[in-house]
Amino acid sequence: PLSMTILSQLDRNKDHNTYVFVLLGIAYSATIGGMGTLVGSPPNAIAASQLHLGFADWLMYGTPVMLVLFPIIIGWLYLVFKPKLGLRFAAEFEKIHMTKQRILTLIIFITVAILWIFGGYINPILSQLLGLPKPIGSFDSMVALSAAIVICVTGIASWKEVQDNTEWGVLFLFGGGLTLSSVLTHSGASKIMADGIVFVIEGGHYYVMALIVAAFIVILTEFTSNTASAALLVPIFISIAQALNMPPLGFAMIIGLGASCAFMMPVGTPPNAIVYATGFVKQSEMIRVGKFIDLTCMVIIATIAYLFWM
């Protein structure tokens, strides 16, 4: 809505490419930005749960990929649509006063971020202070739940407001994905499915395997839920890596990150769907630039995985 308000100062027909550049830039930036942190996208958490990675651990793997992909994606958008970047917009600024609630919200946000990022160091110290025999399990989850409780207790938001503004369907989808991954792993189903795939790719070069897996997940996630795809495939490809005597990190990260790389179809990611729903971006325009971005993501993710994770 904010960008649409700003873009309304332009001529829809004359400056159409600028409209498309800005709107797709926002959608794609949201997708790429989500790769950087554990909470950025459900596939991240699914892959992290199978690899037993914490918030800080994921930052070390996801952030470099995000930083590499972001300028390349903006570059593709510029090359394809050639927007007018020299335009000037009239803007009105409203002074926002720092109320007690806003200050408390900022404090909670900073505290949660610090606890997530430095949880590996803080968790043992906190556990020792509390007299616990071992570090707190699922520390990142406990931090998030504690923050939600503090928000309600301090009156920043009521429980009814939390209920009304929480996307419960997304949470159930996310939880279902984690459950599916766990069931596939512990039931042995992922190993059975992996054995059939190993027979086909065994003996191939690791980089070729990485490219095939990256291409497979990127194409698949264009047409299916990235959460469901990651939930199904992460445990399978971890089993494949183990059968090939490879580190499981490589294939799992390719699936986890690649599941977010849907840039051609409106149904690929929620940001794509939101931008497409504005009516200013055609599906053909998304495909026009998205095919180049998809190919770029396949190569970059596969290359990083091969060089550092396999």
Annotated model-derived regions:
Residues M4, S8-D11, V80-K82, I151-D164, ...:
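C-terminal ends of transmembrane helices
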Residues V162, A277-T296:
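Interfacial loop-to-transmembrane junctions
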Residues P1-N13, Q163-L244:
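Membrane-embedded alpha-helical segments and adjacent helix-loop junctions characteristic
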Residues G25-Y28, T63-P64, V68, S146, ...:
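Hydrophobic residues within alpha-helical transmembrane segments
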Residues D57-D195, F292-M298, A302-M310:
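Hydrophobic transmembrane alpha-helices of multi-pass small-molecule transporters
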Residues P64-F70, I136-A148, G196-M209, G250-M265:
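Structural signature of hydrophobic alpha-helical transmembrane segments
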Residues P1-M35, N44-L51, N226-L257:
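Hydrophobic transmembrane alpha-helices that form the pore/transport pathway of multi-pass ion
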Residues A27-V39, A215-N226, G256-V267:
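Transmembrane alpha-helix interface/packing and boundary motifs in multi-pass membrane proteins
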